[in-house]
């Protein structure tokens, strides 16, 4: 059936090329619809309890796009007229930005930050700073007011006065400019205020999203670099321009098909699936190399067997034979690769799901192009000249290694190789036990990256920028005014503050009530009212002097819901998880029997939810991939043993890579989660091609050792070049500067080394030990 298809195809090559080009141009048009989108929600697992709580908190109190602008003088304190004037100007400019959440801009110079104090007549609530203090006396009085209102001001100024910050939140991120423009607008505001001896650094979600956008855009240039790298390696493989250009053209067509479909269906590009073009380029070019390598073999064989035919007829027969013999294997390998990437949907994360599904379609698209365009274009091209065929056979740097392996196989000395790989697997298993998950800031950026500096400064000199929140939900309006509920909120806040973690500040509505009590009692201990009426009276007093909107970040309008916000000075995953667990357990104990529900979530707990989802998704993904490989190859080879043999080098490669990550301390994160699927999706080609070639040669010569040695010097050579091309292409990502891309580039390159080595070294040693019967079947 396949032979009839290929024969018909090469009979109408121009028609086939025209159809393929028409589809390519049509889908290429839709690439213009592609949009680069950076959405925080696409990186967190929907439906996870911690995420649900976080989304509820964001809806009630905001905080999703909170930004901290820190002022860090190199010497002295921030209590100078010059620095405070800068803080005031930046505060006013941020408050005027479109999309800013009303009343969310807080600083020492913000009218929203109040001074709660008493006078001879009554409790008074006035802005902390009506104007910038200019004289020494004014500055001293201002510092006293800041100290007296530390329940709030400690969020915005360090105890030693060496740093201060402005907090801002946005309720309409797109109106504010989105990731592309908002950071630039903030920079335009703070840049004129910078001077020698004063650092002004933005930090927060806006900063992270902007730099993700910067690093993501660099991938376009890296794609061109990867294209050049893969082209060079293909030229080394064939020593002809045809051998270099044809695989690249077909691979680029596959990329166009995949990106065009993404544009057609409206799938966004993000920092994770932006790497899809490089991946498809590598896989598509790899398949093409397998066909073309086999074409040169078949051309030499047909030319020797049928000297009576013309060179054009030799070319046509070679195209048919190469496509028929490689086609079925390519379809199997491509199907495995496509399903392997499609299985990434098991992670339940929108970004990884999009990456997997888009790559799966791209592989099928590349497969379609390779099974149509390559035979059609190859049959129209001039037959290889004697010089071209001779250059294609020229020894390259992989040949001595493969010849050595073939010699070891022929002489029956492969046992040490078998035991070396067994030992490597054992070491890898130990490393896997050390593997951890981490989706913190440090897992995505290098310490030297620009956005990290702002976070680290805020951590070391201020209250921090990362938060964990406890949502207190009442059964009815005014529930939060219940004195018992307020006491439990206070107790929970005290419990959290005492945890052995770098906690910068714990903020809740009780801080304001205790400060008012402290002022009214002339410096008393600050106690909470013991009745609903007492609480209501405090709040009435505040509304008379202040503004009820000042409370919007602490309680909702009906006093039915409140939030405790914990500011952290670390992004250590284990510390955050320990705090989340402890706070959840204590909240459950404290609020038992009260008409409220207390749940922990929001902020950095999204990273905890992401880690838990990834561990579960990774396990499911590995099981799915293993089953897919065994089922498909077992059906194709009509042997369960054959399916297990194909799985062996893939499992070895995935295991070694995960083990290395464990030993090297590289965590499982958003950037490295897809490594196993990529190891199988790309590496499946190697094992399938090799086993089919061993079977073909075994049926021809009847000697398993000779057949395996021949497969090593033929398919093994193609495998080596494909692996080197994929590795070279992905190593280009190391120039990105983005830790996720750098790690992925290195790990994929390592995957290519381990999967190809396991195929040409470990797999032959296993085949020769078990002598599977399916190799003898036609």
Task: List the predicted regions and their residue ranges.
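Membrane-proximal extracytoplasmic
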Residues: 1-231
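Interfacial segments of transmembrane alpha-helices in multi-pass membrane proteins
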Residues: 11, 213-269, 346-350, 620-665, ...
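Extracytoplasmic
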Residues: 85, 131-241, 252, 487-490, ...
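Helix-loop junctions and hydrophobic alpha-helical segments within the transmembrane domains
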Residues: 298-335, 698-724
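Signature of alpha-helical transmembrane segments and their immediate interfacial
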Residues: 1-38, 326, 376, 390-440
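Solvent-exposed, non-transmembrane loop/terminal regulatory segments of multi-pass membrane proteins
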Residues: 16, 31-78, 84, 132-157, ...
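Hydrophobic, glycine/alanine-rich multi-pass transmembrane helices and their short helix-loop junctions
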Residues: 331-373, 630-634, 656-667, 695-696, ...
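Hydrophobic transmembrane alpha-helices and their membrane-interface caps
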Residues: 243-292, 642-692, 731, 758-762, ...
């Amino acid at each position: 059936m396949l032979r009839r298809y290929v024969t018909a195809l090469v009979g109408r090559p121009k028609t086939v090329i025209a159809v393929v080009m028409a589809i390519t141009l049509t889908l290429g048009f839709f690439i213009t619809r592609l949009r680069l989108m950076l959405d925080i929600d696409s990186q967190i697992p929907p439906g996870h309890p911690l995420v649900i709580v976080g989304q509820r908190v964001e809806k009630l109190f905001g905080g999703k796009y909170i930004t901290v602008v820190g002022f860090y003088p190199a010497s002295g304190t921030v209590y100078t007229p010059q620095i405070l004037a800068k803080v005031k100007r930046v505060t006013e400019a941020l408050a005027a930005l479109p999309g800013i959440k009303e009343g969310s801009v807080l600083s020492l110079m913000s009218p929203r930050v109040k001074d709660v104090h008493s006078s001879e007549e009554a409790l008074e609530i006035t802005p902390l700073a009506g104007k910038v203090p200019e004289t020494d006396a004014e500055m001293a009085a201002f510092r006293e007011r800041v100290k007296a209102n530390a329940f709030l001001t400690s969020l915005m100024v360090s105890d030693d006065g060496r740093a201060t910050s402005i907090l801002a939140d946005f309720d309409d991120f797109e109106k504010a400019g989105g990731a592309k423009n908002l950071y630039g607008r903030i920079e335009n505001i703070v840049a004129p205020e910078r001077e020698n001896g004063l650092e002004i650094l933005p930090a927060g979600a806006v900063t992270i999203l902007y730099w993700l956008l910067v690093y993501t855009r660099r991938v376009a240039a890296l794609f061109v670099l990867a294209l050049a790298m893969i082209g060079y390696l293909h030229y080394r493989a064939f020593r002809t321009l045809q051998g270099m250009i044809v695989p690249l053209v077909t691979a680029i067509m596959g990329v166009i098909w995949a990106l065009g479909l993404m544009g057609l269906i409206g799938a966004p590009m993000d920092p994770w699936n932006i790497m899809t073009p490089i991946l498809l380029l590598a896989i598509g070019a790899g398949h093409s190399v397998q066909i073309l390598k086999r074409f040169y073999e078949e051309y030499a064989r047909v030319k020797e067997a049928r000297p009576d035919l013309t060179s054009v007829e030799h070319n046509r027969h070679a195209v048919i034979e190469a496509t028929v013999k490689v086609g079925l294997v390519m379809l199997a390998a491509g199907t495995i690769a496509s399903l392997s990437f499609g299985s990434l949907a098991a992670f339940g994360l929108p970004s990884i799901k999009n990456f997997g599904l888009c790559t799966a379609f791209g592989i099928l698209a590349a497969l379609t192009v390779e099974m149509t365009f390559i035979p059609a274009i190859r049959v129209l091209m001039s037959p290889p000249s004697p010089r071209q065929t001779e250059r294609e056979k020229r020894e390259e740097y992989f040949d001595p290694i493969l010849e050595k392996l073939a010699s070891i196989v022929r002489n029956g000395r492969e046992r040490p190789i078998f035991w070396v790989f067994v030992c490597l697997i054992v070491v890898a298993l130990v490393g896997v036990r050390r593997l951890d998950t981490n989706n913190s800031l440090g897992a995505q950026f290098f310490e030297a990256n620009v956005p990290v500096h702002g976070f680290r400064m805020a951590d070391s000199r201020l209250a921090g920028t990362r938060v964990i929140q406890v949502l207190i939900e009442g059964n009815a309006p005014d529930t939060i005014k219940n004195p018992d509920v307020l006491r439990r909120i206070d107790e929970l806040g005290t419990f959290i503050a005492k945890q052995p973690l770098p906690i910068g500040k714990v903020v809740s509505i009780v801080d304001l009530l205790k400060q008012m009590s402290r002022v009214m009692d002339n410096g008393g201990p600050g106690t909470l009212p013991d009745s609903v009426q007492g609480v209501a009276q405090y709040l009435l007093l505040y509304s008379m002097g202040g503004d009820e909107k000042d409370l919007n970040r602490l309680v909702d309008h009906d006093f039915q819901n409140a939030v405790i916000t914990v500011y952290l000075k670390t992004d250590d995953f284990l510390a955050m998880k320990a705090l989340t667990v402890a706070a959840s357990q204590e909240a459950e104990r404290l609020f038992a029997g009260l008409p409220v529900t207390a749940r922990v979530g929001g902020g950095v707990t999204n990273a905890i939810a992401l880690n838990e989802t990834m561990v579960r998704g990774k396990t499911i993904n590995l099981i799915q991939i293993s089953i897919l490989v065994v089922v498909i190859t077992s059906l194709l080879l009509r042997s369960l043993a054959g399916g297990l043999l194909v799985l062996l080098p893939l499992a070895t490669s995935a295991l070694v890579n995960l083990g290395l990550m464990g030993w090297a301390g590289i965590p499982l994160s958003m950037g490295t989660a897809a490594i196993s699927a990529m190891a199988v999706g790309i590496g499946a080609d190697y094992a399938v091609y090799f086993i089919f070639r061993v079977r073909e040669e075994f049926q021809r010569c009847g000697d398993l050792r000779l057949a395996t040695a021949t497969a090593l010097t033929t398919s093994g050579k193609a495998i080596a070049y494909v692996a080197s091309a994929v590795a070279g292409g992905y190593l280009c990502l190391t120039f990105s500067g983005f830790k996720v891309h750098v790690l992925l580039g290195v790990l994929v390159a390592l995957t290519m080394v381990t999967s190809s080595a396991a195929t040409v070294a470990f797999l032959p040693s296993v085949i020769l030990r078990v002598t599977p019967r399916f190799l003898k079947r036609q």
